[in-house]
A protein has these predicted regions:
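N-terminal/domain-start alpha-helical segments
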Residues: 1-98
Length: 98
């Protein structure tokens, strides 16, 4: 069978949890152009459940979110999710918390 026709080929799945819609969509476009399957979540309150239910290959997580902050999401999701979590922030003072 020709591998180029195999519709079951694995694409790495990325969940972006980011309330800045412009940044989220730019990141999504970049990742999709590089072969990733991307899902977006804009509300921190739904972040933990999405991580646990979807088990993406990687999570990109903003620190400052409405509903629940990124550090809380990370702490609550980590016991149920072993994949990488990349933290985003525009503020340098947030780095001390991470």
């Amino acid at each position: 069978m020709d591998d180029s026709l195999d519709s079951t080929a694995h694409q790495d799945r990325v969940l972006i949890i980011e309330d800045d819609e412009r940044l989220a969509h730019l990141t999504r476009e970049y990742l999709e152009a590089n072969g990733f399957q991307v899902e977006l979540e804009h509300d921190g309150a739904h972040g933990v459940e999405r991580i646990i239910e979807e088990q993406p290959d990687m999570v990109i997580l903003d620190l400052m979110l409405p509903g629940e902050d990124g550090l809380s999401i990370c702490r609550r999701a980590r016991p149920h999710y072993a994949g990488p979590i990349l933290m985003l922030t525009a503020r340098t003072d947030d780095m001390d918390q991470v």
